Amino acid sequence: MTYIIVGGSAGLGRAIAKKFASEKNDLIIISSDLRDTKAVASDLEIRYGVNVVPLQMSLSKTPMMLKEVDEALENLSSLTGLILPVGFNDPNDIPGIDDKSFFELLNTNFTSVCLFINHFLPILKKLPDTTIIGFGSIAAIRGRSLNATYAASKRALESYFESLRHFVVNSPLTVQFYMIGYIDTNLSFGANMTLFKPAQVDRLAGIVFNNRLRDFGTTFYPKYWKIIKILLPIVPWSVFKKFKK
C-alpha cells in the first residue's frame, strides 16, 4: 500500500509519515524543501524497511505538474491514500496584503490541495479501502484581522471536503477532514497559548492512522474545539471585536 503525503517533511506531515511508515506502508512525501524531504525519506527507509520517495514541489504556484508523482507511483505498491497536512501562514496576513503573498497563501492552503485531489480522485475511487484526508484550522471558525487569507482558505477547503465526501457516496473511498486546534508545530510558534497549550503531533498522527477508513466526515483535534466551534460564532460582535491577538 502506498500513501502520498503532501507536506510530509516537517511538523504534522512528518509525524504522519513516520507513523504510516512504521506500519509498513510505502510513501511518497512531497514538500518544497528537497533536502529535508530526502533526509526524512532516508531515515524512514532505513528505520522501517519501506520504500519512501521524496519529491520537491512548490504548492504556492499553479498550474501544478504532477507527472513526477505519477511516475513514482509506477514503481510502488498500489495507491491507497492521499494525505494533505498542508499549512502555510504569514505574520503579515491581514486584509489588504500584497497580491503575491495573497496568492501564495491561497494556492498553498486551498488551490493546490484541491488540484492534488482532483488529479488522484479517479484512481482512488476505483480501488478498495482508499482514503483522502484533509486538515483545516480552528482559525476558520470565525474570521479575525490576523491570518485573514489563511483562515478563508481553510474555510473554503472545509467546504470542498464536504462536497467531496458527498460526491463519493457509495464508493470505496473514505473522505475525512480534521479541524485542527493548536498543535506543536511551526504554525503555532509565537501564537498566544495562554488558554490553549499545543497538542502533540505524534498523538494526532496515531489517531489519523488508526481511523483512516472511518467515515466520520469532519472531526476536531483536540476534541474540545468542537464546543468552541459552536460557541464562537454566537459571541456578540461587541465582545468579539476586542479579540485582536
Show where each model-derived region lies.
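Residue(s) in the substrate-gating loop at a strand-loop-helix junction
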Residues: S137
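Substrate-binding pocket helix/loop in short-chain dehydrogenase/reductase
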Residues: D93-L106
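Active-site helix of classical SDR
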Residues: I117, S153
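Conserved NAD(P)H cofactor-binding loop of Rossmann-fold oxidoreductase domains
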Residues: P85-P91
